[in-house]
Amino acid sequence: MDQAAVCLTICRINQLLSPSLLLKWWKADPSMSLTSPVLQTVTRDQIKAAALKNEIEQFYPKLPRVLAAYREQGINTIPISSKQYPFWLKSIYDPPAVLFAKGDMTLLSKGRKIGIVGTRNPTAYGKQVVNHLTKEICRKGWVIVSGLASGIDGMSHAASIKAKGRTIGVIAGGFQHIYPRENLQLADHMAKHHILLSEHPPETKPQKWHFPMRNRIISGLSEGVIVVQGKEKSGSLITAYQALEQGREVFAVPGSLFDPYAGGPIKLIQQGAKAIWSAEDIFEELPERNVQYTEPF
C-alpha cells in the first residue's frame, strides 16, 4: 500500500488520525505499512491500532472507485507526497495529509499568495478597505487566499474576481456541503475559474472544529495574513495567531477606537502586527525572497 493511498484512505474513513499523528506515522515508517508496532506507536493504543488497521483494510479496495467518482465531479486529490502539493503549506507544522481541490490547479504553484480574513459583519469602512486593498494586491499579480465565509472572507474573493485577479477559497467542510449557502454562487464560480480547497472528503459536513482547522490552511498557503475588522475574540485572530506560529507575517488594518470590530486589529498591532494603510506597506514587508524550508518527511 503506497503512501498516497494510505493518506487518502485515512481521510475517507473520517480521519481517525490527526494531521500531526499522521505525520508521525509517515516519519516512523515511510512505507506506511500496517504492522502492529508502527500503528501502536502512532495511535498510542493497541485497541485503536487494531481498529484503524481493520478500517483501512476494509476501505482500501473501494478506493479506486471512490477516486473515479471524485474525478467525475471535477475533484482532484492531492496527497502531501505529490509535486502538486503547495510549497508553502507543506512547510507548516501540521499540513493536511491530503487536499481535495476543485478548479484551476495551476494556482497552487504560481503567484505569491496573501491571506485576507475578518469579521462576518463588516461595516461600510471594512468593505471599502477590502475592495481597496484587494484591487492593489491583485494589480501586482498576487493571489488572494481566504475562507469563503460570510463577510470579509467572501468579499475578498468577490473583490479579487472584480479586479480580474486570482483567488483561492479554503472551505471548512466538503464540496458537497458549501457553507454558508449565501456564497454558493460565488463558490461555483471559483470552482470553475479559480480554485477551492478542502482537507475533507467531498461528503463531509462542516463541523464547529473544522473552522479553526481550516484557518491554519489559509495562513499556511500564504506569505502573510491581513486582518480587516474583527472583535477581540474574533475567529480571524485565530488565523492571525496560527500565521505567527507558522512564521508568516501578520498585518492589521487600524480602525476607529469606538468601533468594536476594530478591537481585534488593535490588539494584534499592540502585539507586534504591522499596521497597514495601503498594499505598499505589505509589499515593503514581503520583498522578493527565496524561502527555505525543511520537508516534514
UniProtKB/Swiss-Prot annotation:
Keywords: Competence, Cytoplasm, DNA-binding. InterPro entries: DprA. Induction: Expression activated by ComK. It holds the Pfam family DNA_processg_A. GO terms for biological process: establishment of competence for transformation. Belongs to the DprA/Smf family. Interacts with RecA. Interacts with ComFA and ComFC. This is DNA processing protein DprA. It comes from Bacillus subtilis (strain 168). The lineage of its organism: Bacteria, Bacillati, Bacillota, Bacilli, Bacillales. The gene is dprA.
